[in-house]
């Protein structure tokens, strides 16, 4: 585990300090949950220089539009993961996909279980893909609401919302404000 910096951004220097010859894989979330911060392409490229596999979890990609998937053709040690849980409403069905260099994909295909997607998940996935235009229009509505909510939260005394690229907003409450809201 690598602590993020005071702005909840990825701390590359801290990640490098934790890296040693036993480190084989590093997971990075982008957008990060609960902060909604994006890992920059330059930060990911810097991590890719280390002798390990970098997995970037882009579960909230559809809400951010920010991705490092284009780097997979350049870096054999990069895996980008996506899920249908958030934008397509398939949480709990364990349906997603990975974007990676063909060499890694071939290796993973050799070691994966033969039936790695359940029937319910597959059926839901196919139905979702048939109506992806509708689902993506819902994503746009959520993005609009996120912006509206962020603006409203900025006007509440004692509440400091953090900008987010996810479908959520992290808020900081002034002292005892969280207790007041809880009792509310």
Regions found by a protein language model. Give the residues of each.
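PLP-dependent aminotransferase class I/II
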Residues: 77-155, 159-162
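Conserved PLP-binding catalytic core of the aspartate aminotransferase-like
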Residues: 142-143, 155-184
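Active-site phosphate-binding strand-loop segment of PLP-dependent enzymes
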Residues: 4-62
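Structured helix-beta-strand junction loops
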Residues: 21-22, 50-51, 74-75, 111, ...
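Short, well-structured N-terminal submotif of metal-dependent ribonuclease cores
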Residues: 68-77
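Short glycine-rich anion-binding loops that position phosphate/pyrophosphate groups of nucleotides
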Residues: 31-34, 86, 167
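Hydrophobic residues in well-ordered beta-strands that form the structural core
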Residues: 1, 28, 56, 80-82, ...
């Amino acid at each position: 585990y690598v602590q993020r910096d005071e702005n909840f951004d990825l701390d590359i220097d801290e990640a490098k300090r934790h890296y040693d010859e036993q480190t084989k894989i590093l997971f990075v979330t982008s957008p990060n949950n609960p902060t909604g911060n994006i890992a920059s392409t330059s930060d990911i490229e810097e991590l890719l220089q280390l002798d390990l596999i970098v997995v970037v979890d882009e579960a909230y990609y559809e809400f951010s539009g920010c991705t490092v998937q284009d780097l997979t053709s350049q870096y054999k040690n990069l895996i980008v993961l996506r899920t249908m849980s958030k934008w397509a409403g398939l949480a709990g069905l364990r349906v997603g996909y990975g974007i990676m260099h063909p060499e890694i994909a071939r290796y993973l295909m050799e070691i994966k279980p033969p039936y790695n997607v359940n029937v319910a998940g597959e059926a839901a996935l196919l139905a979702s893909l048939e109506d992806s235009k509708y689902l993506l229009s819902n994503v746009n509505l959520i993005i609009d609401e996120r912006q509206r909510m962020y603006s409203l939260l900025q006007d509440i005394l004692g509440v400091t919302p953090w900008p987010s690229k996810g479908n959520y907003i992290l808020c900081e409450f002034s002292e005892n404000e969280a207790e007041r809201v809880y009792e509310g």
